[in-house]
Structure formats: structure tokens, C-alpha cells
Amino acid sequence: MKETFKGENRVSITPDSAETLVKAGFHVVVQSGAGANASFSDAAYVDKGAIVLPGDDFYANADIFAKIRPPSEEEVPKLAGKTLVGMISPSLNKELYEDLAEQNTNVFALDCVPRMLSRAQAYDVLSSQANIAGYRAMIEAAEAFPRFFAGQMTAAGKVPPAKVLVIGVGEFSSLR
């Protein structure tokens, strides 16, 4: 499902994940242009066995929808009687959640899956997205920093390595 939130460049289903679903026996329908902001063409999805359809045809031919951000007000009626999987944040979007419930939309709010060591850990989207955000933050910090992050020793002289303080916990804070 194409992301409609301004500035959202992620996509919930990549061509490779579409191929995995197709091999598992699912018919995968992708909304035309869904992967464009993430640099995935419609042709890449077709090459992996997915069917690419425009707007209304897409909604009419799919039963389960995957999305990163919560659906927009315009998308909600199109999901009536269907299933939505994604980061819905029901505690922050109570009205949206109630609207989806009123029209019998099944919702799997992946951001509500418990974050603990268990079988559910494979569905912990918050940790994976936080890891990506932390990695990107370091790349952007390195780009904004006026000199090299790593120390340099050249014939022209020596540049000491940057000292960086990472505030937080998790896997990314252990990267060097």
C-alpha cells in the first residue's frame, strides 16, 4: 500500500519480500507507485511475481494491506471489511482506530506487539525501525560534522578522531 504521509519514504513490502510471499503461495498485489519513494519500481515488483494495480483496482483486489504509517482519512473507507497490518499507534490515533473498528477492518498494530524476548520478538517493528533511525542519525551527524569522524594521519599532518556521545540504548549504541 502506497504511503501517503508527507516525507515518508519507506515501503512496507519490498520486491524481495513480495517474492517471499509469492513463493509461500500468496497472491501479492502492490499499489502502483508504492515503492517509488524507496527506489523500487513497479517493474521490480512484477519481476518478483507481484501484480501491480492502480488506486481503486488495488483496493478492490486485495484483502490484506500492509502499511508503515496509519492510513489517511481518505484510505479508511477503502479498508472496510479488510485487514490492515502496520504501525497504527492506536493510543495516539484513537479516533482512527475506532473508525476502522466500526467498519469491521481487522487491524494488526505491529507497534503494539510486546517488546520482550519471546516468539513475538520477530514481529518487533519498533526495534528494527529504531535501529535504522539510529544508523541514519550517525550518518547525518557525520555529514554535518566539519571534519573526519575517523582519525587521519597523512603527510600533511594528523587529524584526531572525533569524540561522539551516543545517548540511548540498544544495538546501535554499541557500533563504533
Cite the ranges covered by each PLM segment.
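Short acidic low-complexity segments
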Residues: 49-61
